[in-house]
Amino acid sequence: MRLVVCLVFLASFALVCQGQGYKGPYTRPILRPYVRPVVSYNVCTLSCRGITTTQARSCCTRLGRCCHVAKGYSG
């Protein structure tokens, strides 16, 4: 009798784990909020060449690496 109860429990647990059994709110995956990609750190170079105006502003506000025309930035 104990063996039958144990097998039934394991079978129902396997169905829930596979998502074929009870579909309650706790068996669904948690959706992650969409996060906008940020400018990667390798874009914020010290030479300020080849980056856009938006990237230059982002580097200046986040990292303190501010590009100026005198340093070679031509945005």
UniProtKB/Swiss-Prot annotation:
This protein's GO CC annotations: cytoplasm
Serine amide found at: S74
Gene Ontology biological process terms from the UniProt entry: defense response to bacterium; defense response to fungus; killing of cells of another organism
Highest taxon of source: Eukaryota
A Pfam family that the UniProt record links to this protein: Penaeidin
Gene Ontology MF terms in the entry: chitin binding
Disulfide bonds: C44-C59, C48-C66, C60-C67
InterPro entries membership: Penaeidin (IPR009226)
Modified residues (Pyrrolidone carboxylic acid): Q20
Segment forming the signal sequence: 1-19
Compartment list: Cytoplasmic granule
Keywords: Amidation, Antibiotic, Antimicrobial, Chitin-binding, Disulfide bond, Fungicide, Pyrrolidone carboxylic acid, Signal
Function: Antibacterial and antifungal activity. Presents chitin-binding activity.
Family of this protein: Belongs to the penaeidin family.
The protein's name in its UniProt record: Penaeidin-3l
